[in-house]
Amino acid sequence: MAETATIARPYAEALFRVASESSAGNLGAWSELVSEMGQVAANPDMKAVADDPNVPGDKLAELFLSVLKSPVSDEARRFVQLLVENGRLTVMPDIAEQFHALKNAREGSSDVEITSAFPLEDGQLNDLVAALERKFGRKLYAQVAVDPSLIGGVSVKVGDEVLDTSVRARLAAMQTALTAA
């Protein structure tokens, strides 16, 4: 995995530079397109086609671009052709991840992974994200998951920081304290 991240980095940086300087759209539109490209490239069927040596590069690029729903600029089209020519289309999910990290760094924002024992209502989620934005001092983009094994409460991960206020975490802490005594 480190190898694909290393391969993806220069592509992500080059694409981010092109997206930042492009007059074809804003960085948000580019981010959506790159994210979609990463999802399409991660599809097992697309991986199989990309790994098939009998599929010509121009047909692979054409197929890949035809699956995308977002509008594709000439720069993005050339980028996909470059990936295909270099045999790197399967690295696109890693490129998308690093592109997103570069965008967050530019905007001074971060992704937050919120795991809750129960589904959160919109108001609860908005209040939680607002409180977390105050705590971390930056704009946060929430990705929410439900994990009933938490029993209650939430677990929050921003970068390498984890705030776990779940009942499961409290029970584990109590168990550790009781067995240590």
From Swiss-Prot:
GO MF terms, alphabetically ordered: proton-transporting ATP synthase activity, rotational mechanism
Subcellular location: Cell inner membrane
InterPro entries referenced in this protein's UniProt entry, alphabetically: ATP_synth_OSCP/delta_N_sf (IPR026015), ATPase_OSCP/dsu (IPR000711)
Predominant location: membrane
One GO term describing the cellular component: plasma membrane
Annotated TM spans: none
Family under the similarity heading: Belongs to the ATPase delta chain family.
Function: F(1)F(0) ATP synthase produces ATP from ADP in the presence of a proton or sodium gradient. F-type ATPases consist of two structural domains, F(1) containing the extramembraneous catalytic core and F(0) containing the membrane proton channel, linked together by a central stalk and a peripheral stalk. During catalysis, ATP synthesis in the catalytic domain of F(1) is coupled via a rotary mechanism of the central stalk subunits to proton translocation.
Name assigned to this protein: ATP synthase subunit delta
Lineage, opening ranks: Bacteria, Pseudomonadati, Pseudomonadota, Betaproteobacteria, Burkholderiales
Gene from which this protein is expressed: atpH
